[in-house]
Amino acid sequence: ANRLDIIIKNGYIGLALVLVVLGVFLSLKTAFWVAVSIPVTLLGTVFGLGLTGNTINLISLSGFILVLGIVVDDSIVIAESIHHYKSKEGNLYKNVVMGLKRVIMPVVTTIISTMLVMSSFFLMSGVLGKFIYVLPVVVLFALAISFLEITFALPAHLATNKIEKPFMI
């Protein structure tokens, strides 16, 4: 099997684990929307790679692996906070916004600091600079798309009247 097949297989396993763990501890709906954020971010990043004339290769796959944990973590942090605030009394939409506001600054700080660190890779010159150029491109696209997804799409999907209960607990 080639490397891409292995990464895709591991991606499916990771997606299943996210669904199970979040379904057990939060709700199936929350688990579903967090899981959806992963392929949305990855597909958006692939689209961005195409726009910049880059391709999927060993270095870009390394970038995907590197950033995937951050993308999943940010989605989980936002979703858990929204889930917590949705269970409180009051206006549902205000509670969703409060859940987002509670954790958005640490998430944004993480995203920006990672983007700054990865941007320094663009300063590398020579053969090595040309060789790893696609790594920060992947990370920057993924983080930017993930940021848009977790600040706009994820809260909108989780803003429903129904308070979901955990699947098992």
Predicted regions and their residues:
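Internal alpha-helical transmembrane segments of multi-pass membrane proteins, especially GPCRs
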Residues: 4-12, 36, 60-64, 100, ...
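Interfacial helix-loop-helix hairpins and adjacent transmembrane helices
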Residues: 88, 93-97, 127, 151-169
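Hydrophobic transmembrane alpha-helices and their membrane-interface caps
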Residues: 16, 20-79, 83
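Hydrophobic alpha-helical transmembrane bundles that constitute the permease/transmembrane domains
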Residues: 10-15, 38-43, 111-115
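Juxtamembrane "pre-transmembrane" interface segments
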Residues: 1-19, 120
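Residue-level signature of catalytic and energy-coupling elements of molecular machines
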Residues: 3, 35, 39, 48, ...
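Hydrophobic, glycine/alanine-rich multi-pass transmembrane helices and their short helix-loop junctions
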Residues: 20-25, 44-59, 108-159
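Helix-loop junctions and hydrophobic alpha-helical segments within the transmembrane domains
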Residues: 4-5, 79, 84-109
